[in-house]
């Protein structure tokens, strides 16, 4: 693919995926406003969030397939208008059904673009600057998640939320305009012999996503005492096991489970999942604590939320500078230890803590999470033979998003149930519930450190960037081979990626 400049591709990547990430976290922050405006209950107001997450996870594996068939430019120019339509539906919605439809369109468009843009982004950087891709992945993608939280806080403060989705739609419209001029057609596989579509895998994935969504809806409505909830989760578990078995055995799977069954991809998946859940739990508890317990003003809460961007910037810069020097394992250890410290401080926070203390904890939370996400993301991507990189990473992203799909609902459900079990005043009950959330986040942080130590024990793995003359100093280049039938010793022997091999590997799905 021809590009004008790698920073243009970076901009296109952020405009393709960022608005969807912003929309998800912003909508979670303005649930109270949505309930007042649309006239819905707490139960139904979270359904659009769940449906959007479901569509996001479900459509991730479709991105590489659509790119292979049609090319990146047509898919880009088709997906972003779908996202714009979804944003307009939400912004103009008068009932929860339209909001759910809008979130489905947003999630589907973002899911399709995720695994199209990540390989394109990494491929666009020259070999000696490839570590800059982490600057965009963490600063742009993870930063979009944080910006969504900040915008949601601002919307809550001013009492209006619809303008958020006009902004998200406008960002996607800018992406369409930029892609029209700078994203060119590429060679794709339409003329080649097409491999048979994995219909069984696609159907099982759809059924799995639907069963998961229904189960979480039942949980929100009836709680764990209902038999329907347990039946739903039982069906979901059976479908998940069936999907893993089918995708492991099929020749051309929709989700390449077999290719990610290596130490680094598995550990990377667990690290990303634990890291994203940790920050979701911590932010939810801390913002609720500040609003309800400390009676902090909305202006101060917005300023505190803005400090999260400082942590994102720190994480992006450190990830880009340190990944090739220390490897994903050590990067994850550093981030995990920061999160352990932050959650330990929140467990023992004093009633008279200053705003400066809160700001420092916010910065450290964002920085620690960013480092762990970088470690898990790149550790999983680079943790196996290169020809299977995109397929392996697609499987990791699908499973990560599937695990995260119901987290917002679980956080809300746990907080309300935990507070209801407590005796005493409402304020004391909520304080105990938030304290329990901090404890859960602390346990997850400790788990992150342990997983990162395991990642570090597997070795540094591939480097992202190196000088062109470095490849002459390395061992003779091995032929690009698939992970199937590859010994562990051979997999670990890859250290520096030859530029030609790297680019051919990332283009593997387009041929």
From Swiss-Prot:
The chain crosses the membrane at residues 7-27, 46-66, 80-100, 107-127, 134-154, 163-183, 200-220, 226-246, 266-286, 301-321, 329-349, 357-377, 394-414, 437-457. GO terms for molecular function: transmembrane transporter activity. GO terms for biological process: transmembrane transport. It comes from the Bacteria. Residues 465-486 are annotated as: Disordered. The keyword Ribonucleoprotein does not apply. GO terms for cellular component: plasma membrane. Its main location: membrane. Keywords: Cell membrane, Membrane, Transmembrane, Transmembrane helix, Transport. It is a multi-pass membrane protein. It is found in: Cell membrane. PROSITE patterns: MFS. Belongs to the major facilitator superfamily. PANTHER family: MAJOR FACILITATOR SUPERFAMILY MULTIDRUG TRANSPORTER MFSC. This is Uncharacterized MFS-type transporter YubD.
